[in-house]
Curated annotation (Swiss-Prot):
UniProt keyword terms in alphabetical order: Cell cycle, Cytoplasm, GTP-binding, Nucleotide-binding, Nucleus, Phosphoprotein
This protein's name: Up-regulator of cell proliferation
Keyword GTP-binding appears in the UniProt entry: yes
Originating gene: Urgcp
Pfam families attached to this UniProt entry: URGCP
PANTHER family: UP-REGULATOR OF CELL PROLIFERATION, URG4-RELATED
Domain VLIG-type G: 689-924
Source organism superkingdom: Eukaryota
Recorded GO MF terms: GTP binding
Recorded GO CC terms: cytosol; nucleus
Length: 926
């Protein structure tokens, strides 16, 4: 039997024969070889190999960074205009401001434009966000002037055929952009200048674009590297196991918590092969290349990295459950170390401790590389080498490789050779086969949380190991420990909701409807008033439960950061409690109810509603609502108020970027006193910057309405399978002071409504009346209304009803109809005939038409549509989820819609000129 060394020599000489994965050599079979290698190691101890990590005694954060390294970070931050954000970090709210740049699809011209260009593109989920190419906007008069004698000479010997060459020559003398910036340097500089919440948002958007995410962020200036655990917590992915036969094949979880096989790719010394390109090929399905990891063949990919060496990136593969599409049958994680392992030993040690297998790419294995890897002789990780050996160094490579084989406990199947003549597709298949073999065998499976534990032991800083973050986590766990059953918790701990709130909302709704009756019976009015007061007295007699009190303490913290940490922890903790269950469509549930003998009251949810932060805030709103009602009726002295501070607490959250509930999703009613209190408090906080434009979005469930708003403005409206589309939420967008005068407002209040059911469901019971009232309210408050549609004739009847009612009142918001391509079909170009069909009332809308006895409204609406008010948006995904990225066509179409909306506001087409006080009055009238 040939020795391992001879086998490797044969493999290298005949590198085109890749063979099959062979069984590994057992450690017991190579004890003699290890002893010989140990003697050779000791003999080389005195040699100057350029490495001092062999004994592993100095593995904590290195404090001896060269002075030149310390200046590189400051130079990069200064170049990018980020030096001012080192003491006071860049925040998420800074990145959301509406400014002149929000209306321009501009290209960066100087390095200081790059961070903002990256954030804008990333907010819009644009796949070109990482492109740091700069374009100088130089007017023709600034082009280099020719010398007079040269110009005269060219006039004498002018030849039309030379025009093209002359143009090229003149352009070559144009001023060139400043020093180009490597995209990885830009990312590192931006993250180092951002607070933890903006970091989290950046990584979330990058994951939607299918970009590799930073896991270990290098910072040579301050002598530490940061493991980004907190920043990754917001990334949630869905996947399906093969085969798609059972309901349990679907999973949705945070990438931080999922334990999966993990494979690391590193470079030792130099390598002719690109790690990142190889990783992209491994992750990409047949005939579709994904550039998940930025590599040398992309724009500026060959630019030298100034501050991003030592960066560790992570990406995942998640299966779709379809064998013909999936590269792997189960989720897997992939790590990529930027830079040489000898210069970034700490990061390499981390990767060896968390990976199922480590792939080392190198062209050279000499004495110093051998000495470096010998220190890993106690490692239990599987190692694979991908070689592209220099012709003159084959013998040296073989000699040291033969010595490493027993040390690392590998055999010839762990040594792969890839040269220019190697079949690339076959090589990628070989790598995938190795990974599948490792995953099938007993191997290390880790989550990002597990990686963070290993990082702490090695001395890396973990970004969530701060007092404020941990205090907020402890408070969240204190609340969640008491939640054993979600439905029971809602009933026992959130007592003011459910049936009491529903009865109160129904009575107040009937009371409000009496104002439209010419001569309402006074006796009926008095009876409704008595019922409302009786219910509010019962609610006011309750005390906030311990869980609600703990929640109020968490969001009332004097530290803004601790408040934000607490809210994020609560969102994730509550989401874990209510993992999404397979659900039938609401149409099916509606048809089943009569058979099951269930209630016919369609104000009840058609699907289980998960417990969320909004339920705790809704409970606070009910306490405030009940107390305010009794004070108005003279049943409670104003001096005995206990909950007057609640609106101020909630408004702080709104200003911090949390969507607040405007319409109660449980009762489909608006708590007028609570919302009025919120708006009054907001008016006080904003002081003189309270001019508002209200933009609302309505539509059928599942049309991507919330995703559209989030992509357009960087908002945080709930999306996904675990959301229950009920009620309406509002979020505030600040307008930059330099732009507010031009735009005509200081703030944009964005309202995202729950889905309005269309078709058969819309005409069932009182549901239509409730949703028509909701649509009337939201459209009546709005300056601009976006109606999201799934089909060209699928305008919800509630929207048409509301339009007709508001037209009678003389209120006409600016309408934009958005048809989203949900099935990845070719998007037709909008034609006037399509617009007319879109607005023609279908037969099942005759009820809305009959109610108002008004046909002109439809003609008016159709007239609006013919003036470019209909948008056809391409499909969201490019490819098949969960590994699909957001399509460039979707991102660009959303940007054009955003620009149109802002132009309409700027040109006064939205009938703005209202402040918060006027909005309060409008709310009361509607």
């Amino acid at each position: 039997m040939a020795s391992p060394g001879i086998e490797v020599e044969l493999l290298v000489k005949g590198h085109s024969d890749l063979g099959e994965v062979a069984p590994e050599v057992k450690p017991s079979d190579s004890q003699t070889s290890v002893a010989i290698a140990d003697l050779e190691w000791r003999e080389m101890e005195g040699d100057d190999c350029g490495f001092h990590y062999g004994d592993g005694t100095n593995e904590a954060q290195d404090n001896d960074f060269p002075t030149v390294e310390r200046s590189r970070l400051q130079e990069m931050l200064s170049l990018l205009g980020l030096e001012t954000y080192q003491a006071q970090k860049l925040t998420l709210q800074d990145s959301l401001q509406i400014s002149f740049d929000s209306m321009k699809n501009w290209a960066p011209q100087v390095p200081k434009d790059l961070p903002w260009h990256f954030l804008r593109k990333l907010q819009a989920l644009n796949a070109e966000a990482r492109n740091t190419t700069m374009v100088l906007d130089v007017p023709p008069e600034a082009w280099p002037a020719e010398k007079e004698s040269q110009a005269e000479e060219e006039m004498m010997y002018w030849d039309p055929a030379e025009d093209v060459a002359a143009d090229i020559y003149s352009f070559s003398e144009l001023p060139m952009p400043d020093t180009p910036v490597n995209p990885l340097d830009l990312l590192c500089a931006l993250l180092l200048s951002s607070d933890t919440f903006l970091q989290q948002e950046v990584l979330l958007k990058m994951s939607l674009c299918q970009f590799a995410l930073p896991l270990v962020l290098p910072d040579s200036e301050n002598h530490y590297h940061t493991f980004l655990l907190w920043a990754l917590r917001g990334v949630v992915r869905t996947w399906w196991f093969q085969p798609l036969r059972s309901l349990g094949s679907f999973r949705e979880d945070s990438v931080v918590l999922s334990r999966v096989p993990t494979f690391a790719f590193v470079r030792m010394d130099v390598s002719s092969n690109s790690k990142s390109q190889l990783l992209n090929a491994v992750l990409s399905p047949a005939r579709r290349q994904w550039d998940c990891f930025w590599h040398r063949d992309l724009n500026l990919g060959t630019n030298p990295r100034e501050i991003s060496d030592g960066l560790v990136e992570i990406s995942w593969f998640f299966p779709s459950g379809k064998e013909d599409l999936d590269v792997f049958p189960e989720p897997m994680a992939f790590l990529n170390l930027r830079g040489d392992i000898g210069s970034h030993w700490l990061q390499f040690k981390l990767l060896t401790e968390v990976s199922s297998a480590v792939f080392i790419l190198t062209d050279n294995i000499s004495k110093k590389e051998y000495k470096l890897l010998y220190s890993m002789k106690e490692s239990t990780t599987k190692y694979y080498f991908i070689l592209s050996p220099y012709r003159g160094k084959r013998n040296t490579n073989l000699r040291f490789l033969n010595r490493l084989i027993p040390v690392l406990k590998i055999d010839h199947s762990h040594v792969l050779v890839k040269v220019s003549s190697t079949d690339s597709e076959g090589f990628v298949r070989r790598i995938r086969a190795i990974m599948c073999s490792v995953a099938r065998s007993p191997c290390r499976r880790v989550s990002v949380e597990d990686m963070a534990h290993a990082a702490r032991k090695l001395g890396l800083r973990v970004d969530e190991d701060f007092e404020e973050c941990q205090k907020a986590k402890d408070r969240m766990e204190k609340i969640l420990r008491k939640i054993k059953d979600v439905d029971a918790y809602k009933r026992d701990e959130l007592r003011l909701q459910g049936e009491p709130a529903r009865r109160a909302a129904q009575a107040e709704r009937e009371f409000c409807q009496l104002q439209w009756v010419p001569e309402p019976p006074e006796k009926h009015r008095a009876e409704l008033r008595r019922r409302v007061l009786e219910l509010r007295v019962q609610q006011n007699g309750q005390e906030p439960t311990s869980g609600v009190q703990e929640f109020i303490l968490g969001i009332s913290s004097p530290s803004p950061s601790e408040r934000q940490y607490f809210l994020r922890w609560m969102e994730w903790g509550l989401a874990r409690l209510g993992q999404p269950r397979p659900r039938q469509p609401p149409e099916t549930l509606l048809t089943l109810r009569p058979k099951l003998g269930g209630p016919s009251d369609l104000t009840e949810p058609l699907w289980p509603e998960p417990l969320g932060v909004e339920h705790f805030l809704r409970e606070m709103g009910q306490f405030y609502e009940a107390e305010s009602c009794l004070i108005e009726a003279g049943r409670l002295p104003a001096g005995q108020r206990r909950f007057a501070h609640f609106p101020g607490v909630a408004v702080e959250l709104l200003l911090g970027g949390l969507p607040l509930e405007l319409v109660d999703g449980a009762t489909l009613s608006i708590p007028v006193r609570w919302v009025t209190g919120l708006l009054k408090e907001l008016h006080t906080r904003l002081d003189r910057r309270s001019r508002l434009v209200v933009l609302s979005a309505l539509g059928v469930p599942g049309t991507g309405k919330s995703t559209l708003l989030n992509t357009m403005f960087g908002l945080k409206f709930a999306t996904g399978r675990s959301c229950s589309p009920r009620g309406a939420f509002m979020q505030l967008l600040p307008v930059a002071e330099g732009f507010s005068q031009d735009l005509g407002c200081d703030q944009i209040l964005v309202i995202d409504s729950g889905g309005l059911i269309s078709g058969a469901l819309a005409s069932a019971g009182d549901r239509f009346e409730l949703e028509a009232s909701l649509a009337t309210l939201l459209m009546g408050l709005s300056n601009v209304t976006v109606v999201s549609l799934a089909e060209t004739k699928d305008i919800p009847p509630a929207v048409l009803h509301a339009f007709l009612r508001l037209e009678k009142m003389g209120h006409m918001p600016n309408y934009q109809f958005v048809y989203q391509n949900l099935h990845d079909l070719p998007v037709p170009s909008p034609k006037p005939r399509d617009r007319r069909q879109l607005l023609d009332p279908p037969s099942d809308l005759s009820r809305a038409t009959h109610l108002e006895k008004q046909g002109g409204g439809f003609r008016t609406l159709a007239g609006l549509a013919e003036r470019q008010h209909v948008w056809h948006i391409p499909a969201l995904w490019h490819g098949a989820p969960p590994m699909a990225a957001v399509s460039l066509g979707y991102s660009e179409a959303i940007f054009e819609l955003k620009r149109c909306l802002l132009e309409n506001i700027r040109n006064g087409l939205s009938n703005q000129n209202q402040n918060i006080q006027q909005l309060i009055e409008l709310l009361r009238r509607l």
